[in-house]
Amino acid sequence: MDDKTRTELEAAVYRRLVEHLRSRTDVQNIDLMNLAGFCRNCLSNWMKDAADAKGVTMSKDQSREIVYGMPFDEWRSKYQKDASPDQKAAFEKSRSGH
């Protein structure tokens, strides 16, 4: 497979992942972190890191809006729930590996 095709496929996979996460607002970021070691914020941070590496100006808010499909504060007020004590404990336990 040539590099151009591979890049196009990877981009399609990324877009599909982001669309899937946008449709699953019931899945909380802390659960993603606890189970998979990454969340929507990680994806947005990686987007910003990639932009920075290419010399593309992008703010943290802009990268989050790309991933969330809306301003982060709006998503948080609509969909984010308070983390339970169990979720917080699992996060603290798994944090040492990040």
Name the predicted role of every residue range.
Residues 1-98:
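Domain-level signature for proteins that mediate thiol-based redox and metal-cofactor handling
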